[in-house]
A protein has these predicted regions:
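Alpha-helical transmembrane segments of multi-pass inner-membrane proteins
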Residues: 1, 14-51, 56-127, 132-133, ...
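A juxtamembrane structural motif centered on a specific transmembrane helix
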Residues: 294-341
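A membrane-periplasm/extracellular boundary helix in multi-pass inner-membrane enzymes
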Residues: 120-171, 188, 192, 323-335
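Membrane-interface catalytic loops of GT-C/OST-like multi-pass glycosylation enzymes that act
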Residues: 58-62, 104-111, 220-225, 277-291
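TM-adjacent membrane-interface loops and short helices in multi-pass inner/ER membrane proteins
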Residues: 60, 178-220, 227, 234-238
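Short aromatic-rich membrane-water interface segments that cap or initiate transmembrane helices
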Residues: 49-62, 171-175, 221-233
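Peri-membrane helix termini and adjoining interfacial loops of integral membrane proteins
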Residues: 38-50, 156-164, 211, 215
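Transmembrane alpha-helices of multi-pass inner-membrane enzymes
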Residues: 73-74, 111-119, 260-314
């Protein structure tokens, strides 16, 4: 019901983009404060303690980076639709790009390349109107942040009464290739049980069993690749047909792109999808729920699909249940945090 008409889809996507803009800006501010070691003095921010790369309140730099990419795409949508004045978008995008560079997330680097290529393609088709030199300027700024911020951090450490941590960009780009070893080990695990797999969410079991004859670099509970995880869980007989269907579904979504909403939606989905090929963002509700919502918005643009109209009472009931679940989550979290500390 929310996206059955074009005007409704635009309105809903605009509201979603406002949420990403606000959350992304707040995330950027928190990450910069963490980098400057101010997080210990400001309430509501996670204290980095021994961590080196800022992660805002996500507790994982790569997750923060992917969320910032989605927020930047939301800013692009608001710019395209002229919903927010450019003078307000520029400082927000500046902080997000700075925080994205501070995360030193190689996953985000790969995603950025894919986003720029797809944007250029859709700009050629006429769905995106932003000038190429604007995209180039922001890209150059982002690359400049990647190389300059570690140096700026070292300078501030020497001449100010603070201890700013950073990782050399060359070492970050070429170090820690453990994912390749993990993938190799998981391929051996698939070869041991190729047809029916190990069961849902049993990657750690697969790791334990395969370690008897093929050692891996670290203990894992995920293959750091959605395709490998899905085949490990279900085996080739069930996994391959489902993966083929997912691929066909994605092809159909991209084939029917016909508006700015669908272009930005595809890019947001793609950012999380690329991340899922290198880690496991699908394990987190703050990615899974928005992606599912965006997929629904993009899917609704196909005019030849069958739709079901539900009574507003279903939505009211869903909101009520969601509110109860949110209260329970907050309660459990408030009980668990003191125990973890």
């Amino acid at each position: 019901n929310l996206s059955s008409e074009k005007a409704d889809r635009a309105s809903i996507f605009t509201g979603l983009s406002y949420v990403f803009l606000i959350a992304g800006t707040a995330t950027g501010v928190i990450a910069i404060c963490q980098w400057l070691t101010l997080d210990a003095y400001i309430p509501g921010m996670v204290d980095m303690q021994r961590a080196v790369r800022p992660y805002a309140n996500f507790a994982q730099p790569n997750n923060m980076a992917t969320f910032l990419l989605m927020s930047l795409l939301a800013c692009l949508y608001l710019y395209e639709k002229k919903k927010v004045q450019t003078k307000w978008l520029i400082p927000a995008v500046f902080m997000m790009l700075m925080s994205l560079a501070l995360s030193q997330s190689r996953t985000s680097w790969v995603a950025c390349i894919c986003i720029i290529v797809y944007l250029a393609y859709q700009q050629f088709k006429g769905y995106i109107s932003i000038k190429w030199y604007y995209v180039t300027a922001w890209t150059v700024l982002f690359v400049g942040f990647i190389f300059l911020l570690p140096t700026i951090g070292s300078f501030l450490t020497q001449f100010a009464d603070t201890q700013i941590k950073s990782v050399d960009i060359a070492r970050r780009a070429t170090g820690d290739m453990s994912r390749l070893a993990i993938w190799q080990q998981m391929l051996h695990a698939i070869a041991d049980r190729p047809w029916f797999g190990y069961g849902w969410n049993q990657t750690s079991v697969a790791y334990t069993l395969v370690s008897d004859h093929f050692q891996g670099p670290v203990w894992v509970r995920s293959a750091h690749n959605f395709i490998l995880d899905f085949i490990l869980w279900n085996g080739l007989l069930i996994g391959l047909p489902f993966l083929a269907y997912f691929g066909y579904w994605g092809y159909q979504l991209n084939k029917h792109v016909n508006s700015v909403e669908s272009v930005i939606g595809i890019l947001m989905i793609g950012a999380v999808l690329i991340h899922s090929m290198l880690e496991f963002p699908q394990y987190y509700a703050y990615f899974l729920l928005p992606v599912g919502f965006i997929v629904g918005l993009v899917q609704s643009q196909q005019s030849n699909i069958k739709t079901i109209t539900l009574s507003p009472n279903y939505m009211r009931a869903a909101y009520a249940v969601s509110l109860v679940l949110l209260i329970l989550i907050v309660r459990d979290y408030s009980v668990m945090v003191p125990k973890l500390n």
